[in-house]
């Protein structure tokens, strides 16, 4: 059975799911599975543990689609083949291209180039995610004349050759969901489980194939979607609305009973909720907000946005607010970061970016890594520069700049750094007068 649960954001869909899982755990009903996106799994586990208590692990669990694939593979005894990492997949692609290069019409000349191999591997990933087979590509190519047909034939050959190579003892991670859909009929979890899908806006063809396999096997599947209405709703929910139609059509094709449940939007009793419901609506609404907690403004460009945000933060601090109580949220960090840093510096606003940083960029780690690179790389100038730029080499930034300029001027590398003799070249280059 397919249960479709929909409603706008903050309408209580997830709380309703948690309540149903909690009731099943209290009734000691095993096989409760909450399927969520990979990046949401830890947060969902914490929420479910808080809702269900210590007995959760006996009757329910939180999985992603890849986690479910590992679970079913272990149950059916099909998880022995080691998974290829990215390097192994590139090697398999190179081997596959070597085998079919003479037959390729468009890609043959560039088949040995690393960039082309990487590009074709990305194309294979997309084809597998969309459940496109080599036969389907061949059939489509037969109907497409000229360049497009040749390109599709080449892709069909590459995909078939890649599958043949990876079938020789190793598993491609992009095939996991395809194999999961095939193995669900052999799994007890597929027949007896109660599945709750939350946190998804839409599903790939591979994920839809898994949902179809669960429905066909007789599992109860509850899907949560964030949208306002199944028909004639707001256009911003178009993707989720299309997903709902696809799921309902799939259940109908499988001969599975469906139920649809709507979670109504909560009353617009706060300024933020009014803004949420009316921002993309073509109708107008009035809400009394004496405190003026929300204001909507427009700007000519991104820099003007950042300038207003920085000036507003400064104004709030001058009115008695603390810097740590002010946050600036932006849709895309890479787009806004340069302008935001520039404008905050202009207005004297201290700025801290709450973002993850690469561990290898930390000064101490970078120092150790650069030291190894220097030793193994023959004292290359770039490795030495990376070592000096960590700030832990005992030189000031000005001294580092002077040393780098000298090294670049005289192309010093290798043994020049390790010989006991001092450097005697003039810092100003050839032709400069000698000094003491």
Regions found by a protein language model. Give the residues of each.
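Polyanion-engaging groove/track-forming segments
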Residues: 1-436
């Amino acid at each position: 059975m397919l249960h479709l649960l929909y409603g706008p954001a903050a309408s209580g869909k997830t709380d309703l799911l948690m309540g149903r899982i909690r009731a099943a755990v209290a009734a000691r009903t095993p096989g409760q599975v909450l399927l969520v996106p990979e990046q949401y799994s830890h947060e969902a586990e914490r929420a479910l543990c808080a809702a269900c208590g210590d007995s959760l692990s006996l009757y329910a669990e939180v999985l992603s689609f890849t986690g479910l694939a590992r679970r079913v593979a272990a149950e059916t005894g099909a998880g022995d083949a080691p998974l290829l990492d990215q390097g192994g997949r590139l090697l398999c692609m190179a081997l596959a291209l070597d085998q079919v290069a003479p037959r390729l019409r468009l890609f043959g000349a560039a088949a040995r180039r690393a960039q082309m191999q990487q590009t074709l591997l990305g194309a294979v990933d997309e084809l597998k995610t969309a459940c496109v087979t080599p036969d389907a590509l061949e059939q489509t190519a037969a109907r497409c004349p000229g360049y497009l047909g040749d390109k599709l034939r080449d892709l069909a050959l590459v995909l078939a050759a890649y599958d043949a190579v990876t079938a020789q003892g190793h598993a491609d991670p992009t095939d996991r969901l395809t194999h999961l859909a095939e193995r669900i009929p052999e799994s007890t979890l597929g027949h007896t489980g109660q599945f709750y899908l939350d946190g998804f806006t839409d599903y790939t063809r591979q994920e839809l194939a898994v949902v179809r396999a669960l429905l066909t096997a007789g599992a109860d599947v509850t899907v949560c979607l964030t949208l306002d209405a199944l028909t004639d709703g707001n256009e911003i929910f178009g993707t989720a609305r299309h997903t709902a139609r696809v799921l309902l059509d799939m259940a109908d094709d499988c001969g599975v009973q469906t139920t649809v449940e709507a979670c109504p939007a909560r009353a617009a009793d706060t300024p933020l909720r009014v803004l949420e419901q009316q921002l993309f609506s073509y109708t107008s609404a009035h809400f009394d907000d004496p405190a003026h907690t929300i204001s909507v403004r427009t700007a000519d460009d991104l820099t003007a946005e950042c300038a207003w945000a920085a000036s507003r933060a400064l104004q709030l601090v001058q009115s008695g607010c603390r810097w740590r109580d002010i946050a600036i949220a932006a849709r895309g960090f890479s787009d806004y970061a340069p302008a935001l840093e520039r404008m905050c510096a202009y207005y004297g606003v201290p700025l801290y970016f709450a973002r993850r940083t690469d561990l290898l960029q930390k000064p101490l780690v970078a120092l150790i890594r650069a030291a190894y690179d220097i030793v193994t790389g023959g004292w290359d100038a770039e490795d030495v520069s990376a070592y000096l730029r960590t700030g832990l080499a005992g030189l000031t930034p000005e001294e580092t700049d002077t040393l780098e300029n000298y090294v670049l001027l005289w192309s010093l590398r290798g043994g020049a750094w390790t010989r006991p003799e001092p450097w005697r070249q003039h810092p100003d280059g050839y032709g400069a007068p000698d000094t003491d």
